[in-house]
Amino acid sequence: AVTVEIKDGGTSFVRITDNGCGMAREDVPKAILRHATSKIKTGSDLEAIGTLGFRGEALAAIAAVSAVRILTKRPEDEIGTLFVCRFGEVISTEDAGCPDGTTIIVENIFENTPARRKFLKKNTTEGSAVLAVCEKFALSRPNISVRFLSDGNPKLQTPGDGKMQSAVYAALGREFASAM
């Protein structure tokens, strides 16, 4: 399951939570490094990536212009990890109680780059763009439950039952799903 929560169109707050495999404590700082991944150890790993997550530059770019917290725990670990960085600088890494999976919280995007902040569109436009990404993700992975909330209001909820028609119904509506 993946839950995406935003406030103010995602310009002040984004929280993405999954119930996946989590990250090892030593891998968490790598998540904000450019061109780094903990998912690939050998060349043959490229053939077998079966997990989702931020790729390549994405989280590094986000971490450079915002405050980021990563809370993660693997099923085999007794305790999770809370990693905090602000504008690309590591603030802390500490033990934390949390469920299996990963939560990434992004706040105050572009606070340190006001010129970039000016290029953001209206909150409703930015929020609609986030919803569109969630819908596309839900349609591409009908076996994963996807939930999206904007300013506390549920906008999307798919069952994750593996049925394309269920995902289409949740993302695009009854009429579209009925036409399938």
Predicted features along the sequence, with ranges:
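N-terminal phosphate-binding caps/lids of nucleotide- and nucleic-acid-binding domains
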Residues: 1-180
